[in-house]
Amino acid sequence: MADERIHVLRDILLELHNGASPESVQERFDATFAGVSAIEISLMEHELMNSDSGVTFEDVMELCDVHANLFKNAVKGVEVEDTEHPGHPVRVFKDENLALRAALIRIRRLLDTYESMEDEEMLAEMRKGLVRQMGLVGQFDVHYQRKEELFFPIMERYGHDSPPKVMWGVDDQIRKLFQTALATAKSLPEESISSVKETFEAFATEFESMIFKEESILLMILLESFTQDDWLQIVEESDAYGYAIIRPSEKWVPERQSFVEEKSAEEPVQLDTAEGQVQQVIDTPEGQFTITFTPKEKESALDRHSQQAFGNGYLSVEQANLILNHLPMEITFVNKDDIFQYYNDNTPADEMIFKRTPSQVGRNVELCHPPKYLDKVKTIMRGLREGTKDKYEMWFKSESRGKFVHITYAAVHDEEGEFQGVLEYVQDIQPYREIDTDYFRGLE
């Protein structure tokens, strides 16, 4: 039955893809599905994008709004303990959306009042207020970054890799619409108020549609899939990205036994005896019995502090880690299988040029970047893998951060010349650009 439902959902989107109107499939959808789970939506998109049906990622992006409208009145909710706690990621996510929607309402009121206002002094103040409110709405980018960098990697681990790809593409479209709306608003009074309203509504329509998709589809997938530990990981890593308009009023700390305590309560009791033997008490329906045995020696864990041959000298794992974390640059390593395997920890996450968090480790490098950059990522990886280039360099000036960022992507080869992966190192070279002397010892 589940397969049939997924196939029907697939057929509906294929019909829309081939030109059918939403109205023509709405009745069939309503008649077939009394309620549809977010997991089925995810499976459907995954099947469409990974089958020979001819539907591509771009096609699903085009269908995204129609898809959302079809499910607007048919998505089943999922209740999970603690999601209404002020610090739970779900509550934080919804509170941000509420604050962002309130800012949209204020902007609409400002634009309507501006249109009928004749007092030039008041108009000037309203223009300042409009830019301030647009700045508040612009914080949605932080909300999107947390979604893309913290939620999406965990979704992919559970096999839901298609929804993140589609939603990230739409997020980027919304970002573009906002930049256009902001630039037009800042151009008042040279730009007409009608142009400002038009560009703002083009953004707001898509933005409000995304809020629906987040709360009625995305969060449902997360609530059905994520464990309590997944949510805790998101809580721990969220501060690195920040929050939109409002911050959590308190930290979410779930009430539960630790998994270690639960596990130990279920395991048989072990008692140490003389001469290295162990007695184990085992419960059975008929009663308890005790066995005595000598455990095998376990292989010792890697000693992080013991010296190992390392390049032209000796280092412990701990020393190597400290050295990498003290380098004045951000380092990322992607292995030969295109898996993001490592990044160093030389600066607080919220100060990183390119933010990295533990949840991203183990992710395919193509999924670590917005869809709009996918072709560039593939070009770099292919060029370094095939040896057409040893490294790629790029740089840009970030006025907002006061940094001049230099990036290098270098191929990593072993002693036999075999490709082992790509090393990315990123540094702020602005301090070096400001050097204006030929000589300096730094000892004074």
Predicted features by range, described:
Residues 1-141, 145-392, 396, 403-405, ...:
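Small-residue-biased structural context
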